[in-house]
Amino acid sequence: VYVMPGLGGIKFSDRHASDTAELLTKASPDYIRLRTLEIFPGTPLESLQKNGEFQEAPEEQVVKEIRTIIENTDTETEIVSDSAANLLEINGSLPGEREKMLDAIDSYLDLTGREKLEFSLHSRLNSFIGQYGGLTGDIYEKLTPFLNHNTLNISGASDNEIRSVITLIRGKLMP
């Protein structure tokens, strides 16, 4: 079964997570694959977003959705997070590895706002490089001010600069 954290947007995030956990408990699938929502250009969801009918949930809220799903799904199953769209790699079996997965999520949630941004950037960069074998020119150009001998140092980057790179990368990742 594929589950799409973030599909409820900001408005329905909590309900989406709790309803998903309830449905998964009833369905008792062998595998649950997490595929975080990505809004692609030219899609009906992008149109809804542009006209204000849909507000995309921020990454932290999506991570909280995943936490709710794992915490409240009461069945034997495997959780697999193998999509480039996912911020965190959360893999394990329920119920046996529930605490391990929740601990990994809580480690992220315990980060400061800046640490979450930096984590997101590194996660997205690793996903992109893993998927495409390198960076595109536009991503490289945005990172150039923060590269020193091919080592990324974003300590001098503003939060908005980091968000801008994350947005660019997410727009290019294939789910």
Can you annotate each of these PLM segments?
Residues 2, 17-20, 83:
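Residue-level signal for functionally critical sites in structured catalytic/ligand-binding pockets
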Residues 1-10:
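Mobile, glycine- and charge-enriched loop segments
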Residues 9-26, 88-90:
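Catalytic cores of alpha/beta
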Residues 25-33, 37-175:
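Auxiliary Fe-S-binding modules of radical SAM enzymes
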